[in-house]
């Protein structure tokens, strides 16, 4: 009779979130995300799924904290490999996860076709197959059970989950899981998923994840502090104006979910206040267009300011005169030939795939242009190389000189920094908290976060190791 947890991903790294809760013989998986980074390495890790010793069919239920790819990207693969249990998530997470997973299936199919044709030209053998396809996504979607915030629900014998708002992206949650084994031992665990930030546009602030015995905590920015939201607006205003004065293009790699909508919101505000010139703003991402539509139908997730814009003032924060959405490949290609000044927001946020790569191929060589980094860039990604100051980068099969200006605004991050995390922890009963497990961070960030939490008075802080089973009851 026992209760234990084990991290199968996002332990001593940021991507691939998967945490296994075992209560006697019952297995609950919290998140099933994809690894990102260098393609071959990430692909091998994703195909390993839960490792050699755990079959997908042995998982009784999946709790999904939110719809980012590194938390939901392998859900269809899990179902394909034999998982038949329920997937518990908020309704907004369900809608966004459907979009993310379907897009991933399409990208994999396209990559397989392209790589197959390239191998054929070289008379080479090609046997790479996508992890999953559209059918697998549809099958996984049939397993979703939507759960509202603050509505505890039994997900297995002796196991209950309650969702609280994590303030990270639309529909994101903390999962407070109460587990009781057959011997009568009870443990209340708090899974932070990704901890959000106060004062972010559109969505509500993170709630208090109190009344817990064990905490599994996001540590992405354990060694960094963010700019304030107001500083970020001024910085964005400055970058737009300087690029416009050079008659250049401002190219912004952005995740299609949340980051793009937040950028639209902020550019709308700057435009309405006359702080930036009336130049074309293009969102070149089919998924971002669809995600923005999903944002529009989930007002239950809005903060008061955004809710009032929609309901009291009947104003759409995701639409204004300068904003355009590209709806075809031809629209996207035309942007590469268009003259500046203009702004292009495009996915993928880490520049690993998608239309952003074509905009970078056409724009990096021009010193009038700016590439603005507004989110986390995992090690090994093109975005990380640009952020770290590379003078030449490889995109697809060609090399490109980096003459464009590279700027960064980290205040758009949806992850709390270390100080915000410590402040958020003030609401938790520290004397009740028996143990904290740090996940979702690179080694330097995890070690720094451990030190900050010790300084804040937390005891028994563990940096979780991949595959290590921690018995908690």
Where on the chain are the PLM-derived regions?
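Metallo-beta-lactamase
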Residues: 104-169, 299-339
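Short active-site oxyanion
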Residues: 60-61, 83-86, 249, 278-280, ...
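Cap/insert and terminal regions of metallo-dependent hydrolase folds
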Residues: 174, 197-284, 370-375, 393-458
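Core dinuclear metal-dependent hydrolase active-site scaffold
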Residues: 1-57, 139-204, 330-337, 343, ...
């Amino acid at each position: 009779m026992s209760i234990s947890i084990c991290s199968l991903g996002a332990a001593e790294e940021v991507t691939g979130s998967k945490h296994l809760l075992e209560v006697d013989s019952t297995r609950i998986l919290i998140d099933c995300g994809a690894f990102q980074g260098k393609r071959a390495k990430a692909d091998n890790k994703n195909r390993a799924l839960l490792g050699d010793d755990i079959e997908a069919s042995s998982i009784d239920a999946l709790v999904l904290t939110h719809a980012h790819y590194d938390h939901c990207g392998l859900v269809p693969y899990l179902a394909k490999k034999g998982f038949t249990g329920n997937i518990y998530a908020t309704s907004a997470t369900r809608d966004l996860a459907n979009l993310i997973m379907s897009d991933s299936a399409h990208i994999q199919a396209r990559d397989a076709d392209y790589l197959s044709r390239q191998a054929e030209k070289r008379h080479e053998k090609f046997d790479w197959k996508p992890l999953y396809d559209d059918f697998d996504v549809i099958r996984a979607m049939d397993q979703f059970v939507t759960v509202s915030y603050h509505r505890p629900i039994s997900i297995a014998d002796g196991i209950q989950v309650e969702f609280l708002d994590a303030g990270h992206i639309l529909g994101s949650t903390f999962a407070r899981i109460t587990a009781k084994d057959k011997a009568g031992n009870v443990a209340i665990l708090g899974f932070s998923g990704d901890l959000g930030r106060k004062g972010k546009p559109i969505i509500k602030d993170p709630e208090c994840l109190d009344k817990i015995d064990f905490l599994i905590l996001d540590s992405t920015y354990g060694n960094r502090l963010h700019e304030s939201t107001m500083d970020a607006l001024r910085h964005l205003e400055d970058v737009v104006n300087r690029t416009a004065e050079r008659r250049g293009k401002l190219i912004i790699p952005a995740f299609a979910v949340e980051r793009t909508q937040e950028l639209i919101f902020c550019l709308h505000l700057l435009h309405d206040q006359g702080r930036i010139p009336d130049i074309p703003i293009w969102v070149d991402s089919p998924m971002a267009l669809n995600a923005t539509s999903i944002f529009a139908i989930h007002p239950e997730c809005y903060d008061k300011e955004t809710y009032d814009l929609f309901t009291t003032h009947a104003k759409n924060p995701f639409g204004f005169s300068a904003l355009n959405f590209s709806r075809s490949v031809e629209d996207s290609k035309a942007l590469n030939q268009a003259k500046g000044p203009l702004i292009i927001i495009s996915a993928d946020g880490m520049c690993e795939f998608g239309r952003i790569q074509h905009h970078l191929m056409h724009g990096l060589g021009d010193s009038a242009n700016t590439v603005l980094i507004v989110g986390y860039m995992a090690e090994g990604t093109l975005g990380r190389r640009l952020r770290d100051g590379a003078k030449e980068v490889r995109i697809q099969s060609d090399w490109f000189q980096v003459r464009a200006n590279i700027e960064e605004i980290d205040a758009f991050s949806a992850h709390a920094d270390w100080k915000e995390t410590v402040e958020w922890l003030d609401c938790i009963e520290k004397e009740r908290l028996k143990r904290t497990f740090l996940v979702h961070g690179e080694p330097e960030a995890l070690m720094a976060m451990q030190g900050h939490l010790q300084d804040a008075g937390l005891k028994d802080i563990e940096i979780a190791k991949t595959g290590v089973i921690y018995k908690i009851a």
